[in-house]
Amino acid sequence: KPGTAERYLQNNYITTAKALEYFEKSVSAAVNNDLKARSMYMAARCLMNRQMAETRIEIAKTGTFEFGYFYIDSDVWKPKIKSLLATNKWIKSLQNFAPQTRFHQIMIRECSLYNDYFGENSESVFF
């Protein structure tokens, strides 16, 4: 019988695995670059959900949390988060593809999370 952590990682609500599957199909089927960039971004977010779920389990197992709050900004976890972002294939694809799209220009202006990952200062912040 799988343990709590394994059951947590099998929960589609937590990992968004099914959504990732559909966004990956959408990337392949996209009829224009903006739709392709949007699909890549959503696939990247889905993969990040999975990666963060795995990180939360690791944090819980190592006891590096207090009162239910995870210290993801701590010196212990910053390198881990950076390495997760570096291994997210959709973030890498989006970094190379999106800057030429209208979607990218809108998201840089409207979404602070997107700007953190793909804006002018993203290289120094995450990679």
Report residues per predicted region.
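Acidic, polar-rich low-complexity tracts and alpha-helical solenoid repeat scaffolds
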Residues: 1-127
